[in-house]
């Protein structure tokens, strides 16, 4: 799917979420694009890489392969299955693992749950103060630990810019 096609298909969900929450639709679209590779991989309508919790019902979760960047090689207990662990030049560790993620009946369900996540978790309080600015929100969400990728904020900001350029 091209960026223009992605925007056309998923912008209505992002705009509706922005209307309800004040979170910039540009940020929402950028995060969905980043997490899915512009909808190349959307297992279980999961657009935002949201992990399943301990209390997530079995029918609402799926076991998927993912990459995590962590500070210790001794965190294998965090995952149902560890495929590999490699030390990076930064001193951090790249884990290739299987982990539980949420799944949704519809794309809209994924977009709605994603927005609620920010309001339900105190770590995003500072981010919510700047939720109308997609660039600042991306910075704060990354600082709060949404993802383990060290370049998460800069990746989001590049995609926000690409969406702005293709959003005509």
Predicted features and spans:
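Catalytic cores of secreted/periplasmic lytic hydrolases that degrade extracellular macromolecules
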Residues: 1-168
């Amino acid at each position: 799917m091209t960026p223009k096609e992605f925007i056309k298909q998923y912008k209505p969900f992002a705009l509706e979420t922005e209307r309800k929450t004040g979170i910039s639709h540009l940020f929402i679209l950028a995060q969905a694009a980043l997490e899915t590779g512009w909808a190349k991989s959307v297992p279980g309508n999961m657009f935002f890489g949201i992990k399943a919790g301990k209390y997530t019902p079995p029918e609402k979760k799926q076991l998927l392969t993912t990459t995590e960047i962590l500070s210790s090689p001794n965190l294998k207990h965090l995952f149902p299955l560890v495929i590999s662990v490699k030390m990076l030049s930064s001193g951090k560790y790249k884990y290739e693992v299987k982990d539980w993620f949420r799944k949704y009946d519809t794309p809209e369900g994924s977009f709605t749950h994603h927005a609620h996540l920010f309001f339900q978790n105190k770590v995003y309080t500072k981010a919510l103060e700047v939720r109308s600015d997609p660039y600042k929100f991306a910075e704060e969400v990354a600082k709060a630990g949404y993802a383990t990728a060290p370049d998460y904020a800069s990746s989001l900001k590049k995609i926000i810019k690409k969406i702005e350029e293709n959003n005509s």
